[in-house]
């Protein structure tokens, strides 16, 4: 029987940098986490993972089996550099190829959810044409994901196009495909002028995972827990009361800190204390 404990994971970029996944998963286990979320960002180093050999992919699978710590999700932020909404056909084609490779990678190693960045373009000016291309790119991506039985899940972003669950639901309704769902970030959601509790309730039935971090208006990264605007207890209460039973992922960027493990342990204890206050006793 599967445990009723709330699945709590940690973002790869919170842990010491490096390419040894056995060491990373062992550390995550020592720190009390159930899973680690992989990052495939716009750097050449992390993008190269999508070209891993069969042996490299098998090494990741073996590390998961050996440690018992899962890698069920991928944060695919590489589309900042190669956006699906780009008006440059070559750049957009690269974005679609990255999506194809990411879906194949996920299928090979057992990743179930690929979190998408909700940017039509990031470094360029957005317009109606970039949004149209983005929609068409998502449609093509979801078709690929459907064939592979891999879920694509849209993050609620630090960007106006996708800064609320309501906006992301518009894309879910447009695509009308069970392999496209939502992956809200309660930090990003809280940093905008949103009714956070109503937004979370609106997403129930489409939320496959939740990012946990603190933010301030206009500051979306590296805000210490408890120093931002997020009402964690209310968010956890709302999700619990709405029937959400899925995973929570602590998102941090402490991989270059003096002692990443200590930073992560401190954040873990802080988050679990708020979960306990919200009545999520399994996380206490």
From Swiss-Prot:
Enzyme Commission code(s) on record: 5.1.3.22
Top-tier EC class: isomerase
Claim: Amino-acid biosynthesis is one of the keywords in the record: no
Recorded metabolic or biological pathway in which this protein acts: Cofactor degradation; L-ascorbate degradation; D-xylulose 5-phosphate from L-ascorbate: step 3/4
One biological process term in Gene Ontology: L-ascorbic acid catabolic process
Pfam families in the cross-refs: AP_endonuc_2
Superkingdom of source: Bacteria
Keyword Cell membrane listed: no
Induction comment from the UniProt entry of this chain: Induced by L-ascorbate. Repressed by UlaR.
Gene Ontology molecular-function annotations: intramolecular oxidoreductase activity, interconverting aldoses and ketoses; L-ribulose-5-phosphate 3-epimerase activity
Gene3D superfamilies tied to this protein: Divalent-metal-dependent TIM barrel enzymes (3.20.20.150)
Reaction equations catalysed: L-ribulose 5-phosphate = L-xylulose 5-phosphate
InterPro entries per record: L-Ru-5P_3-Epase, L-Ru-5P_3-Epase_Enterobacteria, Sugar_Epim/Isomerase, Xyl_isomerase-like_sf, Xyl_isomerase-like_TIM-brl
Keywords annotated in UniProt: Isomerase
Function, as annotated: Catalyzes the isomerization of L-xylulose-5-phosphate to L-ribulose-5-phosphate. Is involved in the anaerobic L-ascorbate utilization.
Protein family: Belongs to the L-ribulose-5-phosphate 3-epimerase family.
Protein name, per record: L-ribulose-5-phosphate 3-epimerase UlaE
């Amino acid at each position: 029987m599967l445990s009723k404990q709330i699945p709590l994971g940690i973002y790869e970029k919170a842990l010491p940098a490096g390419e040894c996944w056995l060491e990373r998963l062992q550390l995550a286990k020592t720190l009390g986490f159930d899973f680690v979320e992989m990052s495939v960002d716009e750097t050449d180093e992390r993008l190269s993972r999508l070209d891993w050999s069969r042996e490299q992919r098998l090494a990741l699978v073996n590390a998961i089996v050996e440690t018992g710590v899962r890698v069920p999700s991928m944060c695919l932020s590489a589309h900042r550099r190669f956006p699906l909404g780009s008006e440059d056909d070559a750049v957009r084609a690269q974005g679609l190829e990255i999506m194809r490779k990411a879906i194949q990678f996920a299928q090979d190693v057992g990743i179930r959810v690929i979190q998408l960045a909700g940017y039509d373009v990031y470094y360029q000016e957005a317009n109606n044409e970039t949004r149209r291309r983005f929609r068409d790119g998502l449609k093509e991506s979801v078709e690929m994901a459907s064939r592979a039985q891999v879920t694509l899940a849209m993050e609620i972003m630090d960007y106006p196009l996708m800064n609320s669950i309501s906006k992301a639901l518009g894309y879910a309704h447009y695509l009308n495909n069970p392999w496209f769902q939502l992956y809200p970030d309660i930090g990003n959601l809280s940093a905008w002028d949103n009714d956070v509790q109503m937004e979370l309730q609106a997403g129930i039935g489409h939320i496959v995972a939740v990012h946990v971090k603190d933010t301030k208006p206009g500051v979306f990264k590296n805000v210490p827990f408890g120093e931002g605007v997020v009402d964690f207890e209310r968010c956890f209460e709302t999700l619990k009361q709405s029937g959400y039973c899925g995973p929570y992922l602590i998102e941090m960027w402490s991989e270059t800190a003096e002692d990443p493990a200590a930073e992560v342990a401190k954040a873990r204890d802080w988050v679990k204390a708020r979960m306990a206050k919200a009545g999520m006793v399994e996380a206490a």
